[in-house]
Amino acid sequence: MSLFTSLPFLLLTAVTASCADTETENCENIRKTCPVIACGPPGINGIPGKDGRDGAKGEKGEPGQGLRGSQGPPGKMGPQGTPGIPGIPGPIGQKGDPGENMGDYIRLATSERATLQSELNQIKNWLIFSLGKRVGKKAFFTNGKKMPFNEVKTLCAQFQGRVATPMNAEENRALKDLVTEEAFLGITDQETEGKFVDLTGKGVTYQNWNDGEPNNASPGEHCVTLLSDGTWNDIACSASFLTVCEFSL
């Protein structure tokens, strides 16, 4: 074997011996410290050891990004808050159109009122002509029914009228022409016997008694009726006679 051929082998042997000397030296140093350890060449890697015990429990982590749940039911209404401060005034609006003249409306309303009043007066005249009698500023109407005096008084009042009460001969004649049978007048002496007054309590100044009347022939003759000839008779208020009411025009 030539020198050049064996040179690599010699170098490898030298390196190996050097490494072995180094490891032997390290092992000797360890053996001096712990005599039970025997020095030798390094062994091959062993198989992996068993898993170690579980470590201590870590701190609680942050909530994860889970799926969003469904919306819950509405909560109870909270208490009413305190009133807020007034807002700032809004901008001034545009100028409006000129208003209409109210005088035209007033004149129109006055004209329409006059027309309605005229029509109402015409209707009154028709009613009086067909159903009643008009004299001066009074109109007399009858429903053709007979009833006691208090019922006559109530019925006339319901229609904003009064029991017919002639205040003069002209009104008495108008009543006579209207009725064909005995009718109550709005005159009584219920408060004071022999003192006949109208339903307002005012003494009557016009009277047209029949001969011998009033005679108070029977108890309770405190009312007055108009006879067919236009004269008056005192009679019991509980009796039933024709109803005649008067209305102011």
Swiss-Prot record:
Residues 43-103 are annotated as: Disordered. One of its GO terms (biological process) is complement activation, classical pathway. Transmembrane segments: none annotated. PROSITE patterns: C_TYPE_LECTIN_1, C_TYPE_LECTIN_2. Residues 50-62 have a biased composition (Basic and acidic residues). One of its GO terms (cellular component) is collagen trimer. Residues 113-131 form a coiled coil. SUPFAM superfamilies: C-type lectin-like. It holds the Pfam family Lectin_C. Residues 79-95 have a biased composition (Low complexity). Disulfide bonds join C156-C245, C223-C237. Residues 1-20 form the signal peptide. One of its GO terms (molecular function) is D-mannose binding. SMART domains: CLECT. Gene3D superfamilies: Mannose-Binding Protein A, subunit A. InterPro entries: C-type_lectin-like, C-type_lectin-like/link_sf, C-type_lectin_CS, Ca-dependent_lectin, Collagen, CTDL_fold. Hydroxylation on proline residues within the sequence motif, GXPG, is most likely to be 4-hydroxy as this fits the requirement for 4-hydroxylation in vertebrates. Keywords: Calcium, Coiled coil, Collagen, Complement activation lectin pathway, Complement pathway, Disulfide bond, Hydroxylation, Immunity, Innate immunity, Lectin, Mannose-binding, Repeat, Secreted, Signal. PANTHER family: MANNOSE-BINDING PROTEIN C, PULMONARY SURFACTANT-ASSOCIATED PROTEIN A. Calcium-dependent lectin involved in innate immune defense. Binds mannose, fucose and N-acetylglucosamine on different microorganisms and activates the lectin complement pathway. Binds to late apoptotic cells, as well as to apoptotic blebs and to necrotic cells, but not to early apoptotic cells, facilitating their uptake by macrophages. The coiled-coil domain mediates trimerization. This is Mannose-binding protein C. It comes from Bos taurus.
